[in-house]
Amino acid sequence: MVLIVALLVFFCFLTAVPAALDPKLTGTWATKSRKVVTGPAFYDPAEDRFQEPENTGISYSFTEDGYFEEAYFRAIPNPTKPSCASAMMQFQHGKYSVESNGSLVLTPFAVDGRQLISSPCKSEGSMYFRFNQTEVFKRYEVLTDPFHNVKRLNLYQFDGTPMNPMFLVFDPPQMLPTETLNPTAQASATGRSKAKRGLPYGSGMASSRNKRPSTQVGGLTDPDKWWWAGVMMTLVGGVAFLYSESPWKDW
């Protein structure tokens, strides 16, 4: 009995241990162009829209108390038609942890992630999604870059592939509030999988390329008017048929 109680206490202690954090990660990091930086200049949660930077790039921010934010702006080449390259913008934020094996795990707030894919040569123009994907980096390094003499962050994807190095641009970090920004009753899927759902874009970039004709109500396309017209035509046809078959039609 004593052994069981001891095991229960030990288990409770393990579950109460907070996730490991690394103060060396604190700050805002950006790739060499420094044109893509986390914060309100990249994604505006009030208007629910992206603001297109001058150049492509990646940015990550981390806080001392375990929160992260990411900003992606990438070009997607089209090998068969180079003039029809696409672009992708992506925002996520949430909590991070450093695992015992040295991996870095980013767990986003499921309802807040956004992704915009612009395809100028496709009829739909742009697609705007709610986006949720947990990210796992096999390892990371924080060091002083020998050439630029500034702090550099090296991230290695889950399979060990290195990402473009990022450099410290802000400390303390430049971020949006570390809380759910767009609460909704129906959260998108969680876990280490990607969940996309279409949603209206609002008033931001590429909205004019994704407009669809509105449906008229009250004109010829009103289904109620077509229904009543059908009823009247049926009645008229029925009366004409009865009259043609009646014995007094020749009187």
Curated annotation (Swiss-Prot):
Gene Ontology cellular component list: endoplasmic reticulum membrane
Pfam family, one: Rot1
Alphabetized InterPro entries for the sequence: Rot1
Keywords: Endoplasmic reticulum, Glycoprotein, Membrane, Signal, Transmembrane, Transmembrane helix
UniProt-annotated stretches for the region Disordered: 184-218
Signal sequence extent: 1-19
A GO term for molecular function: unfolded protein binding
Predominant subcellular localization, coarse grouping: endoplasmic reticulum
Ranges facing Lumenal side: 20-225
Coiled coil location: none
Keyword Metal-binding tagged: no
Membrane topology note: Single-pass type I membrane protein
Cytoplasmic face residues: 247-251
Name of the protein this chain belongs to: Protein ROT1
List of glycosylated residues: N101, N132
Function: Required for normal levels of the cell wall 1,6-beta-glucan. Involved in a protein folding machinery chaperoning proteins acting in various physiological processes including cell wall synthesis and lysis of autophagic bodies.
Composition-biased stretches (Polar residues): 205-218
Protein family (similarity comment): Belongs to the ROT1 family.
Keyword Transmembrane set for record: yes
GO BP terms, alphabetized: 'de novo' protein folding
Lineage: Eukaryota, Fungi, Dikarya, Ascomycota, Pezizomycotina
